[in-house]
Amino acid sequence: MCNAAFPRRTPRCSGLQTSTLLLAIVAAAARPALADTGSTSTGDPAPDEISYFGERVYSLRQWPPDSGYGISYRKTFAPYFAASLAYLNDAHFPGHHRDGVTAEAWLPIVPLSNRFTLSVGGGPFYYYDTVFARNNGGYADAHGWAWLASLDATIQPWKSGPWRHLFFEGRIDYTSPSKSIETTSFGIGIGYRGISDIYDKDVEVAKGFAENEIVASYWKTVTNSFNSSSHTARAEAIDYRRQIWKELRFSVGFLNEGDTQLIRRNGITTEGWLEPSFNSGLWSIGAGFGFYTAIDKYRPAPGRHVSDVVSLTLSLRPIRNFDVRLLWHRIVTDYNRDADILLWGLGYRF
């Protein structure tokens, strides 16, 4: 079973292929436009860091290790302080299929040069764990908070040339939730360093991409259970996205999750986003959080129900005003019907 996809319980190889393909296109398109990275110590903006890493995840001794992965966005605010948002997959262990999102503060403890950094980080980890349960489905979607501690080392082999924005990463992550399993993860990955559009001296470039965007999307829903591959459906969505201030955006949309046999759900999503853009709006990466007001035809309780939604997105603009967008939504419910929605979308910016 392939364990490295863009989110967790969807068919994993296909998720990895799509996200890797889009990242490769972004890297190739952005190479000529990148300037040398700056430093907050000189007054120049520090580059943002985006990385994808695979991890070997260890838990109880009687369980063999499994493969996990993560996606991270890090922003440097001062020479010795940075903050990151990340999605972490904590692999599959007996009775536990866990992943989650985290926000960490980072302190570089060996800032030897711009080419090599060693940092220690920590912050809250909100996890989603599919666990065994004595109910009709045989499982429950358990949610909870924990602390995450991390150690991270990066090296940037090239300081000039077409690959100067790439870096390689090694990291260790540790978390021990009070109501879930303890895990220690050892990972390696590849990343991209680039200056966000908001720091460009050209006022028009600093705006990033257009203030408004309409996106029509289509792909699939996967209901989170121990037999997720049997509970999938086609999904479609339409969204309106609006820039609020610099890298902050807001979206409202309609989502139809289809019929997975466990859910038959559709409704309205509203989310706030942190979405920096790069290379004059050529591409962007973002994380969102909000609410999903939906009707589930298979839920006994009548009427609309409000769930949380956590999202990631990556967009690429191949031609003027049009963009291709990859979206992942995690629907977080209180009735054991969490779901992953993966969407490919075509957007129009104006």
Predicted regions: what they are:
Residues 77-135, 237-307, 316:
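Gram-negative (and chloroplast) outer-membrane scaffold detector with strong preference
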Residues 48-50, 79-85, 111-118, 158-168, ...:
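Repeated loop/turn-to-beta-strand initiation elements of outer-membrane beta-barrel proteins
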Residues 1-48, 80, 113-114, 160-164, ...:
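Cleavable N-terminal export/targeting peptides
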Residues 182-204, 214-220, 338-350:
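Outer-membrane beta-barrel "beta-signal"
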Residues 53-57, 86-90, 121-127, 171-175, ...:
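Outer-membrane beta-barrel pore domains and translocons
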